[in-house]
Swiss-Prot record:
It is a single-pass type I membrane protein. Residues 609-784 are cytoplasmic. Interacts with LY96, TLR1 and TLR6 (via extracellular domain). TLR2 seems to exist in heterodimers with either TLR1 or TLR6 before stimulation by the ligand. The heterodimers form bigger oligomers in response to their corresponding ligands as well as further heterotypic associations with other receptors such as CD14 and/or CD36. Binds MYD88 (via TIR domain). Interacts with TICAM1. Interacts with CNPY3. Interacts with ATG16L1. Interacts with PPP1R11. Interacts with TICAM2. Interacts with TIRAP. It comes from Bos taurus (Bovine). Glycans are attached at N114, N199, N442. GO terms for biological process: cellular response to diacyl bacterial lipopeptide; cellular response to triacyl bacterial lipopeptide; inflammatory response; innate immune response; toll-like receptor signaling pathway. Pfam families: LRR_8, TIR. There is a cross-link at K754 (Glycyl lysine isopeptide (Lys-Gly) (interchain with G-Cter in ubiquitin)). This is Toll-like receptor 2. Residues 639-782 form the TIR domain. A motif (ATG16L1-binding motif) lies at residues 761-778. Its main location: membrane.
């Protein structure tokens, strides 16, 4: 028994292990190219069953704690491995040994307390390595990256425990495109630790205090292109002029991101600009100036300019003591060489006139997302301000008058590019004044609803996208590029207004079609973006768009952004794929064919009616319908005649001289209704027939060859037949005056044929001895 229990326990463990591995493997989603996604799946280990077909594996944001030697040994073709944001604390020595094709490795934000160079000894082609956010204090006992000759991006360090950088740490690295070091609590930096890297394109350094900043700059200043300092408090920063005054420098750009300055440390940074002579561009992003701008008591007066800095960018600058700030006049002289200035989202409402006049080399000025208005712009664009300014960006400020804005900028004689988008102009005046060299104007997202002659005739590029325009009828003879997307235009502009237009972007309007003739009228048009409109996929439009093979060279967003809005059965389909039926595309031909068919049908109907007495049947039907509207049976008191006699006029002699004599002069006499004698004059003959039949007890039909040729006899027969069958009585009496061949009776006398087959009829005997019996039977039939 114990042995049986032991066997069952072993099988249960095996089954559970297999199910667990299967569940983890199924948590991955892999596409046919070998890209497998397993991020955020709550995995606690690397899934088993991975094969050589896996080329990219994302296991980030899970609960993996361990990477073993066998976990990835079959992934010999793996190029990308993401293991970031897990709980990995152990990586075995040969975990990545078989990944000889690996180019991207992310081990960031785990719990690695020790790093081993053996992990990377076979990763010769590795280009990207991220080790940020782990728990290690140093980069290992030996050179960690000496086996990575092709490494181009390296990220190391953490915000707490990483405190030391040693000379061996970066040995073996000669060129890096990007190096990011997170060392907020750096305490030890051994000189020349970064000097072994001969060329660094971009260095990002997270440093809380600037104590070791100058030592690091000394090592990298000759091998670095761009230096970015993040999350640093520079309150105590002091720049030593002797440190780099005699060294050649290659740094071209400095970036300060989330850095805090004081008035004193700002002066030290300005000194750095002077002594690192290669710096051409400086950027301050989300920085804080903890000062009041009082530089007069400092040594700033000994600095005449900002070195060789040509581009200055400031974004989201915070000045807590802004309302105590000085006029900055002491720094005005430093700005004379600056050519490009960007100050975004920093609550700037005024550029003092004196500062504008000192910016004598300025060619580009961007004051986007600030508080500039016409009143403050008047002071900023004063006389002699920005004398060489060519581009001015005032996007998303507080400008309201287009006319006044243009007038205030007349002092800028060299201005050719103006961006005043995202201001609330709402309307455009009929006339405006602009600087004489204006070539580019951006009025997008300004809520204007119409365009007028206010726009300068010298424009070459105009952007009026995202407004409320429903037409474009301006003549701009020099315009080369027009951006008018996201408006309410229903058609393309007239090409005669824009003779040299080469680029037009008119997507997201309500245009429903355009033709080959319209496009051909723009003789110099090379680029057209017209997608996202409500296209009516007519036959002409589809024929044009689908038949032009070269259309894709002009329509930059063709074919995906061109969708049908109607007809309904192709709505949502790409114009390129839409198909219409023959009837939709050749409607005139279809209508013509239908009309011809209808004409032939009417002609055929007429011929058939003539051949088969159709008109006769129609007349009879109308009379029959009239009869149907009358009461089915006349009341007894309304019966005026014993019998209505239906006969042909050609048989009148027999009726009037024989039958009338025998019946009306009999005792008691019968009262007969004859059309010659008893029909009411002036009344429609059909009504006379109907009324006479209705007021007669019986209807006598005198049948002969003449009878079947009489149209009125046919009416009388039909109305009598109506009574005979609809009222189920014996109202009809047939007298066969002469033998009639049933086959000779016309087809329209179908009811006569039916009556002769279903009712007994009286034959007029030629033998006079039998005639008395005939009259006797007739009288009996009338009385019945």
């Amino acid at each position: 028994m114990p042995r049986a229990l032991w066997t069952a326990w072993v099988w249960a463990v095996i089954i559970l292990s297999t199910e667990g591995a299967s569940d983890q493997a199924s948590s991955l989603s892999c596409d046919p190219t070998g890209v497998c996604d397993g991020h955020s799946r709550s995995l606690n280990s690397i899934p088993s069953g991975l094969t050589a077909g896996v080329k990219s594996l994302d296991l980030s944001n899970n609960d993996i704690t361990y990477v073993g030697n066998r976990d990835l040994q079959r992934c010999v073709n793996l190029k990308t491995l993401r293991l970031g944001a897990n709980e990995i604390h152990t990586v075995e020595e040969d975990s990545f040994f078989h990944l000889r094709n690996l180019e991207y490795l992310d081990l960031s934000y785990n719990r690695l307390s020790n790093l081993s160079s053996s992990w990377f000894r076979s990763l010769y082609v590795l280009k990207f390595l991220n080790l940020l956010g782990n728990l290690y204090k140093t980069l290992g006992e030996t050179s960690l990256f000496s086996h990575l000759p092709n490494l181009r991006t390296l990220k190391v360090g953490n915000s707490n425990s990483f405190t030391e950088i040693h000379e061996k740490d970066f040995t073996g690295l000669t060129f890096l495109e990007e190096l990011e070091i997170s060392a907020q609590n750096l305490q030890i930096y051994v000189p020349k630790s970064l000097k072994s890297i001969q060329n660094i394109s971009h260095l990002i350094l997270h440093l809380k205090q600037p104590i070791l900043l100058v030592d690091i700059l000394v090592d990298i200043v000759s091998s670095l292109d761009c230096f970015e300092l993040r999350d640093t408090n520079l309150h105590t920063f002091h720049f030593s002029e002797a440190s780099i005054s005699e060294m050649s420098t290659s740094v071209k750009k400095l970036i300060f991101r989330n850095v805090q300055f004081t008035d004193e440390s700002f002066v030290e940074v300005v000194k750095l600009f002077n002594y690192v002579s290669g710096i051409l561009e400086v950027e301050f992003d989300d920085c804080t100036h903890d000062g009041i701008g009082d530089f007069r008591a400092l040594s700033l007066d000994r600095i005449r300019h900002l070195g060789n800095v040509e581009t200055l960018t400031i974004r989201k600058l915070h000045i807590p003591q802004f309302f105590l700030f000085h006029d900055l006049s002491s720094i005005y002289p430093l700005t004379g060489r600056v050519k490009r200035v960007t100050i975004e989202n920093s609550k700037v409402f005024l550029v003092p006139c004196l500062l504008s006049q000192h910016l004598k080399s300025l060619e580009y000025l961007d004051l986007s997302e600030n508080l500039m208005s016409e009143e403050t712009l008047k002071n900023s664009a004063c006389k002699d301000a920005w004398p060489f300014l060519q581009t001015l960006v005032l996007r998303q400020n507080r400008l309201k008058s287009l006319e006044k804005t243009g007038e205030l900028l007349l002092t800028l004689e060299n201005l050719n590019n103006l961006d005043i988008s995202k201001n609330n102009f709402l309307s455009m005046p009929e006339t405006c004044q602009w600087p004489g060299k204006m070539k580019q104007l951006n009025l997008s997202s300004t809520r204007i609803h119409s365009l007028t002659q206010c726009l300068p005739q010298t424009l070459e590029i105009l952007d009026v996208s995202n407004n409320n325009l429903d037409s474009f009828s301006l003549i701009l003879p020099q315009l080369k590029e027009l951006y008018i997307s996201r408006n309410k235009l229903k058609t393309l502009p007239d090409a005669s207004f824009l003779p040299v237009l080469s680029v037009m972007r008119i997507s997201r309007n309500i245009i429903n079609t355009f033709s080959k003739e319209q496009l051909d009228s723009f003789q110099q048009l090379k680029t057209l973006e017209a997608g996202g409109n409500n296209f009516i996929c007519s036959c002409d439009f589809l024929s044009f768009t689908q038949g032009q093979q070269a259309l894709g060279r002009v329509l930059v967003d063709w074919p995906d952004d061109y969708r049908c809005d109607s007809p309904s059965h192709v709505r949502g389909q790409r114009v390129q794929d839409a198909r219409l039926s023959l009837s939709e595309c050749h409607r005139a031909a279809v209508v013509s064919a239908a009309c011809c068919a209808l004409f032939l049908l009417l002609l055929l109907t007429g011929v058939l009616c003539h051949r088969f007495h159709g008109l006769w049947y129609m007349k009879m039907m109308w009379a029959w319908l009239q009869a149907k509207r009358k009461p089915r049976k006349a009341p007894r008191r309304d019966i005026c005649y014993d019998a209505f006699v239906s006969y042909s006029e050609r048989d009148s002699y027999w009726v009037e001289n024989l039958m009338v004599q025998e019946l009306e002069h009999f005792n008691p006499p019968f009262k007969l209704c004859l059309h010659k004698r008893d029909f009411i004059p002036g009344k429609w003959i059909i009504d006379n027939i109907i009324d006479s039949i209705e007021k007669s007890h019986k209807t006598i039909f005198v049948l002969s060859e003449n009878f079947v040729k009489s149209e009125w006899c046919k009416y009388e027969l039909d109305f009598s037949h109506f009574r005979l069958f609809d009222e189920n009585n014996d109202a009809a009496i047939l007298i066969l005056l002469e033998p009639i061949d049933k086959k000779a009776i016309p087809q329209r006398f179908c009811k006569l044929r039916k009556i002769m087959n279903t009712k007994t009829y009286l034959e007029w005997p030629v033998d006079e001895t039998q005639q008395e019996g005939f009259w006797l039977n007739l009288r009996a039939a009338i009385r019945s």
